[in-house]
């Protein structure tokens, strides 16, 4: 899945929001992602985006 700037996309009830970048997601159900950075994720406290990014942080030790 590619998410381009200004577009929100829902994947398994998690909303991704990119800001001028392309976000490519692989194997979301297992938490594997590529190309996501803090700058292009919606990470509001308590929302699905925040949970999604936390999963990313745990996978890659950020």
UniProtKB/Swiss-Prot annotation:
PROSITE patterns: TRYPSIN_SER. The keyword Disulfide bond applies. It comes from Lysobacter sp. (strain XL1). Keywords: Antibiotic, Antimicrobial, Disulfide bond, Hydrolase, Protease, Secreted, Serine protease. The active site is at 48 (charge relay system). It catalyses: Preferential cleavage: Ala-|-Xaa, Val-|-Xaa in bacterial cell walls, elastin and other proteins. Belongs to the peptidase S1 family. It is an enzyme of class 3 (hydrolase). Inhibited by phenylmethanesulfonyl fluoride (PMSF) and p-chloromercuribenzoate (PCMB). GO terms for molecular function: serine-type peptidase activity. The keyword Protease applies. GO terms for biological process: defense response to bacterium; proteolysis. Optimum pH is 8.0. Active from pH 7.0 to 11.0. Optimum temperature is 70 degrees Celsius. Gene3D superfamilies: Trypsin-like serine proteases. Has bacteriolytic activity. Monomer. This is Alpha-lytic protease L1. Its EC number is 3.4.21.12. It is found in: Secreted. InterPro entries: Peptidase_S1_PA (IPR009003), Peptidase_S1_PA_chymotrypsin (IPR043504). GO terms for cellular component: extracellular region.
